[in-house]
C-alpha cells in the first residue's frame, strides 16, 4: 500500500538486484490470484467478480473482502491519478497534494468490505491466535485504511496510526510464518517512507514507535518484490519510485518496463516509463 502497507530482519536470502519477477501472480490458479492480476491491470469489474466468487465459496475467509476493498482503493487511485510517480519522486508535490474528491459510493463499499474483513479476521484470531491468514488479512485491512486516509483524504496522522497497526500485525505474522513475504511490505514501507523525513522528524516519529530506517525499509520492499505473491507488483512499483529518488533511472526503467509487459492493460507503467529521461 502506498504509505500504509511497512519488519523484523532474520536471515535474508541473496537475490540479484535486477531479478524481479514478471509472472508473480498472473499464472495463479485461484479466484484471488486472478482478481489481483485483474486489479493490477485496472480491470476492476473483473477483479470484483473474481473476489466475489472467492467470497461465495470461502465465506469465512477475510482475504475475500479485504481483497475486494483493495480493488475499490485502486479504482480511486486510478481515477485520481494517485499512483503518478511524480507525486512521490518530489517531496513538495507529495506534501502539497491535499484532500481529493472522493466517490461516496466507492468509499462506502470500501469501508463495508474492510469492516467485514476485520470482523472475520478478529473472529478467526479469537479461535486461533496464530492464524497466519487472518493476521495477513488484518495487516491489509489497516494498510488499506492508511492508504485511503493519507492518499485520498490527506490525513497523514490518521494514516500513520493505521500504518503502525499494520506493521505490528505484520511483525507478529512473520514470527509465525516467516515465508509470507507479502507481509514484509508493511514494515518496509513504514521504514522507508518515514525514513525519508528530516532527522528531527525521524527522531520524533521514533518516539512514537514508528520504524524510520529507509535503507532497511527498502530491503523489506525488495523481498516482497522478489518473492511476494499478491503484493509483489505493487512492491515493484514502489521500488521504481525509490530508484528515481536515488537517481537510478536505469533501474526505474527496468522495473517499469517489466510491469508494463506483465500488465499491458494498465497504462500507468508505460506512461511513467516515458517520463524518465
Regions found by a protein language model. Give the residues of each.
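Canonical tetratricopeptide repeat
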Residues: 67-68, 137, 186, 238, ...
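Residue-level recognition of tetratricopeptide repeat
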Residues: 61-62, 131, 180, 231-232, ...
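Flexible, glycine-rich surface segments
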Residues: 219-238, 242-255
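Short coil/linker segments at helix-helix boundaries
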Residues: 17-34, 38-50, 60, 71-130, ...
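A cross-kingdom marker for long, charged
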Residues: 241-277
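Bacterial N-terminal signal peptides
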Residues: 1-11
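Sec/Tat signal peptide C-region and signal peptidase I cleavage site
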Residues: 12-16
Amino acid at each position: 500500500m502506498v504509505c500504509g502497507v511497512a519488519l523484523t530482519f532474520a536471515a535474508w536470502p541473496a537475490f540479484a538486484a535486477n531479478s524481479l519477477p514478471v509472472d508473480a501472480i498472473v499464472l495463479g490458479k485461484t479466484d484471488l490470484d486472478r482478481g489481483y492480476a485483474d486489479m493490477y491491470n485496472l480491470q476492476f469489474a473483473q477483479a470484483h467478480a473474481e473476489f466475489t466468487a472467492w467470497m461465495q465459496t470461502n465465506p469465512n475467509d477475510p482475504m475475500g473482502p479485504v481483497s475486494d476493498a483493495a480493488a475499490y482503493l485502486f479504482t480511486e487511485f486510478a481515477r485520481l491519478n494517485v499512483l503518478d510517480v511524480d507525486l512521490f519522486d518530489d517531496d513538495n508535490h507529495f506534501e502539497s497534494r491535499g484532500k481529493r474528491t472522493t466517490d461516496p459510493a466507492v468509499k462506502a463499499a470500501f469501508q463495508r468490505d474492510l469492516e467485514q474483513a476485520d470482523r472475520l479476521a478478529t473472529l478467526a484470531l479469537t479461535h486461533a491466535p496464530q492464524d497466519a491468514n487472518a493476521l495477513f488479512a488484518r495487516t491489509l485491512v489497516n494498510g488499506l485504511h492508511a492508504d485511503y486516509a493519507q492518499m485520498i483524504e490527506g490525513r497523514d496522522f490518521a494514516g500513520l496510526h493505521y500504518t503502525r497497526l499494520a506493521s505490528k500485525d505484520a511483525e507478529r505474522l512473520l514470527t509465525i510464518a516467516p515465508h509470507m513475504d507479502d507481509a514484509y511490505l508493511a514494515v518496509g514501507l513504514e521504514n522507508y517512507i518515514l525514513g525519508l523525513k528530516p532527522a528531527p522528524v525521524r527522531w520524533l516519529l521514533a518516539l512514537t514507535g514508528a520504524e524510520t530506517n529507509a535503507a532497511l525499509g527498502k530491503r523489506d520492499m525488495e523481498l516482497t518484490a522478489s518473492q511476494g505473491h499478491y503484493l509483489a507488483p505493487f512492491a515493484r512499483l514502489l521500488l521504481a519510485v525509490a530508484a528515481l529518488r536515488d537517481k537510478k533511472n536505469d533501474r526505474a526503467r527496468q522495473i517499469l518496463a517489466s510491469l508494463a509487459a506483465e500488465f499491458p492493460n494498465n497504462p500507468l507503467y508505460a506512461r511513467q516509463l516515458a517520463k524518465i529521461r
